[in-house]
């Protein structure tokens, strides 16, 4: 008995030791994963001059976590430390965000942005690559969304990037300078302006307003590494670091023909950051050198018309659609020459409080929308999420779950191809998932081509959205309801077969809505419907009353005749 008891104890002890080792191993894996993610964010989202500091912060944070665990014997939440650095959140929050990503892979809240530039005078926030959030967004993996905010009378350092930048001025006014093909073009910009800074061109800007922030929303088309953007600063010093200082001293002396001492003094002096304060006189001189041109029509394109350089004010154009429920302004390659080679259309949508846009989809373009102001709700109809529920799962989470390490690019391609083949075997028309999302200032949402979308403004505020439509050439906007509904074009026989109803009944359905593009929202239309029903009831009662009076009159006349 004693021997059996001793054996049982030894087995239990071995089991405990094994469990402890497994737990420690699991904890080590979690720490390794957390550190790897932190380092990856440094590489992808931080400019070169901040990367070394970011890597050191990741290592320091990892060491602090280990010390806290040793001291307290538990797993402390390090969210405060990470938020202070703008580097994300804890493992538990990452998992929660993954679950949210699977439910709503096309919607990104304000917290999804990461600050890649921070100073007392402003910031630049960058949305992570779309394909990292969901495999459904692989089609726009080369695009990123960024928001620049510059305080009054601030200056953004000259830089160039390896991405084409299509910009919309959401608020304020300033000047922008772009050096391209050996020429410097300097323009005044204001709210409603669209301008383009091609990849590799040196550009800088200043907020010339003494009271308001300058806010510029951007979509960046990366051309080197898909989804990754690098900022290059030639002028600079220690912060931002000039890339000129990375050349050898001999190359620097030969290139500039000045002494090493002067070079070190010049390239090591600036340390105030990417966005700095400018004096009133400096701002006035920058404004004086800026051209006021470029806000008029940019069509026809050369050689049939004269090219007009500079920004294009979208809000000064005639709306594409306009009624009491909303307005749609657009700038495309036909109206703005600078967009011609980028296959992007820029649109600004204003939806009146309590109204909505008519349901529609784009035939070719992918809509990347940023909420400028107001609140509302978006409904996106998606067929992918109804097939097994894994369509919106993060690439990173799938890689970790599959092998516990990063897969090679070839394995990713094989997995994607396999998934596509499985999807092709699915039966079509077997259900859709409706993605519903609350919208507020700073929300980004993506609408893939072919996906129907409705955006409703809250009853308390007008909703204003800027949209960057990627792959805009030859795109058509197909409205599904309203006077311009594409369904009205169906043959009568097609209507009968498709709806299993008579063509007359289908026409009654399609012709009931007498407005186009922008409609009364659910609450407004609901109230109008109730008012209409009340009016019908009153009318019927009124008709009944007059009929009763007529009957009584006829009876009296008949009685008198008798």
From Swiss-Prot:
UniProt-annotated location(s): Secreted
Keyword Glycoprotein: yes
Residues of the Cupin type-1 domain: 106-264, 312-507
Region (Disordered): 63-103, 383-430, 516-550
Keywords, alphabetical: Allergen, Glycoprotein, Secreted, Seed storage protein, Signal, Storage protein
Keyword Hydrolase assigned: no
Biased composition (Acidic residues): 409-427
Domain of life: Eukaryota
Pfam family, one: Cupin_1
Signal peptide residue numbers: 1-23
Glycan attachment points: 350
Principal location class: secreted
GO CC list: extracellular region
Gene3D superfamilies given in the database record: Jelly Rolls (2.60.120.10)
Gene Ontology MF, one: IgE binding
Biased composition (Basic and acidic residues): 63-88, 390-408
Family according to the record: Belongs to the 7S seed storage protein family.
Functional note: Seed storage protein.
Name of the protein: 63 kDa globulin-like protein
């Amino acid at each position: 008995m004693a021997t059996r008891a001793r054996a049982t104890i030894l087995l239990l002890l071995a089991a405990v030791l094994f469990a402890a080792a497994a737990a420690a191993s699991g904890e080590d894996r979690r720490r390794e994963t957390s550190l790897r993610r932190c380092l990856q964010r440094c590489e992808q989202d931080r400019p070169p001059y901040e990367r070394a500091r970011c890597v050191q912060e990741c290592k320091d944070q990892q060491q602090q976590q280990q010390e806290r665990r040793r001291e307290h014997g538990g797993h402390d939440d390090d969210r405060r430390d990470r938020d202070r650095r703008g580097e994300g959140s804890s493992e538990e929050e990452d998992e929660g965000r993954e679950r949210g990503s699977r439910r709503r892979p096309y919607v990104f809240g304000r917290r999804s942005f990461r600050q890649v530039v921070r100073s007392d005078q402003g910031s630049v926030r960058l949305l992570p690559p779309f394909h990292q959030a969901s495999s459904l967004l692989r089609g726009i993996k080369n695009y990123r969304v960024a928001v620049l905010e510059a305080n009054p009378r601030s200056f953004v350092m000259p830089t160039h990037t390896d991405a084409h930048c299509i910009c919309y001025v959401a608020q304020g006014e300033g000047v922008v300078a772009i050096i391209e093909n050996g020429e410097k073009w300097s323009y005044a910009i204001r709210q409603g302006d669209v301008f383009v800074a091609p990849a590799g061109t040196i550009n800088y800007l200043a907020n010339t307003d003494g009271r308001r922030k300058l806010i510029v929303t951007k979509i960046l088309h990366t051309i080197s590494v898909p989804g990754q953007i690098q900022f290059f600063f030639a002028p600079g010093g220690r912060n931002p670091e000039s890339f000129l200082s990375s050349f050898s001293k001999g190359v620097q002396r030969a290139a500039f023909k000045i002494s090493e001492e002067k070079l070190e003094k010049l390239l090591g002096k600036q340390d105030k950051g990417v966005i700095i304060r400018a004096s009133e006189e400096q701002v006035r001189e920058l404004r004086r050198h800026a051209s006021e041109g470029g806000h008029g029509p940019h069509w026809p394109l050369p050689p049939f018309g004269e090219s007009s350089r500079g920004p294009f004010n979208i809000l000064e154009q005639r709306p594409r659609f306009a009624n009491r429920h909303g307005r749609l302004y657009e700038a495309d390659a036909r109206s703005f020459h600078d967009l011609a080679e980028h296959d992007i259309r820029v649109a600004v949508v204003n939806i009146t409080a309590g109204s909505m846009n008519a349901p529609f989809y784009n035939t070719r373009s992918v809509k990347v929308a940023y909420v400028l102001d107001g609140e509302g709700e978006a409904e996106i109809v998606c067929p992918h999420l109804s097939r097994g529920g894994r369509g919106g799962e993060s690439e990173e989470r799938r890689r970790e779950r599959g092998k516990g390490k990063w897969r090679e690019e070839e394995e990713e391609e094989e997995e994607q191809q396999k998934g596509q083949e499985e999807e092709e075997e699915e039966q079509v028309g077997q259900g859709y998932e409706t993605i519903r999302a609350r919208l507020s200032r700073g929300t980004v949402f993506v609408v893939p081509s072919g996906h129907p979308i409705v955006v409703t403004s809250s009853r308390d505020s007008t909703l204003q959205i800027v949209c960057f439509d990627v792959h805009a050439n030859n795109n058509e906007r197909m409205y599904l309801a309203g006077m311009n509904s594409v369904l009205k074009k169906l043959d009568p026989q097609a209507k009968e077969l498709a709806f299993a109803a008579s063509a007359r009944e289908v026409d009654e359905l399609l012709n009931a809505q007498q407005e186009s593009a922008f409609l009364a929202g659910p609450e407004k239309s609901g109230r109008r419907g109730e008012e209409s029903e009340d009016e019908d009831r009153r009318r019927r009662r009124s008709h009944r009353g007059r009929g009763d009076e007529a009957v009584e009159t006829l009876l009296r006349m008949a009685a008198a005749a008798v």
